[in-house]
Amino acid sequence: MKSRNGPLRVGIGGPVGSGKTALTEKLCKAMRDDYSVAVVTNDIYTTEDAEALVRMQALTSDRIVGVETGGCPHTAIREDATINLQAIAGLNERLPDLDVVFIESGGDNLAATFSPDLADITIYVISVCQGEEIPRKGGPGITKSDLLVINKKDLAPFVDVDLDVMDRDATRMRQARPFVFSDMKRGDGVGTIVDFLKEQGGL
């Protein structure tokens, strides 16, 4: 099921260092053989994340666009998504068979959200390294995203985090909304996220 404006648009948000780019890379590699995929990355003053995805060979460079948001990166995914919508339109023009576009936000905080005009599905990524209390702090990313990804679960013993506490708090804060624990370094959890996108996005 493509959106009215073309390909399915998946917004990936989360704080700096949570693993957004790693997730984007893994999703691209997992889906590129079956779907026509592209990426738009958001950085404040550089296109560093886009360049990183090219180096990782997530996709060919013509399928990855980096936009420089300047100032506050939240604005480019929420109040005024024009720069991202233009990037998607450009990709769609070059690649008319596009099925999925991942929109990776700049590093943001728990209050950041994607405009519904920009993203059909939203994924919010947090890391266990931020502390086991993060899920219960709430905020739109934690409570309202379509899927919450709790990443770097392998590091929990090293940062004194109890995954059972995070599981309990995420269940309470999100109510019926799904979440998944992941380890992007090893690709653990990627299959579950891909299945979620296929089901929710009608791919």
Curated annotation (Swiss-Prot):
SUPFAM superfamilies: P-loop containing nucleoside triphosphate hydrolases
Binding-site residues for GTP, renumbered to this chain: 14-21
Keywords assigned by UniProt, alphabetized: Chaperone, Cytoplasm, GTP-binding, Nickel insertion, Nucleotide-binding
Record localization: Cytoplasm
One Gene Ontology molecular-function label: nickel cation binding
UniProt-listed InterPro entries: CobW/HypB/UreG_nucleotide-bd (IPR003495), P-loop_NTPase (IPR027417), UreG (IPR004400)
Major localisation: cytoplasm
BP-aspect Gene Ontology terms: urea catabolic process
Pfam families given in the database record: cobW (PF02492)
One GO cellular component term noted in the UniProt record for this chain: cytoplasm
Summary of subunit composition and partner proteins: Homodimer. UreD, UreF and UreG form a complex that acts as a GTP-hydrolysis-dependent molecular chaperone, activating the urease apoprotein by helping to assemble the nickel containing metallocenter of UreC. The UreE protein probably delivers the nickel.
Family: Belongs to the SIMIBI class G3E GTPase family. UreG subfamily.
Function recorded in the entry: Facilitates the functional incorporation of the urease nickel metallocenter. This process requires GTP hydrolysis, probably effectuated by UreG.
Name of this protein: Urease accessory protein UreG
Annotated organism of origin: Rhizobium rhizogenes (strain K84 / ATCC BAA-868) (Agrobacterium radiobacter)
Phylogenetic lineage: Bacteria, Pseudomonadati, Pseudomonadota, Alphaproteobacteria, Hyphomicrobiales
